[in-house]
């Protein structure tokens, strides 16, 4: 999901 994609860091 795009919301969790920012947490891929």
Swiss-Prot record:
Positions where Phenylalanine amide occurs in the chain: 9
UniProt entry tagged with the keyword Secreted: yes
Tagged with keyword Secreted: yes
GO cellular component: extracellular region
Tissue: Detected in the thoracic perisympathetic organs in larvae, and the dorsal ganglionic sheath in adults (at protein level).
Transmembrane intervals: none
Keywords: Amidation, Neuropeptide, Secreted
Gene Ontology biological-process annotations: neuropeptide signaling pathway
Subcellular location, record wording: Secreted
Primary location class: secreted
Protein family membership: Belongs to the FARP (FMRFamide related peptide) family.
Protein name stated in the entry: FMRFamide-5
Organism: Lucilia cuprina
């Amino acid at each position: 999901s795009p919301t969790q994609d920012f947490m891929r860091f």
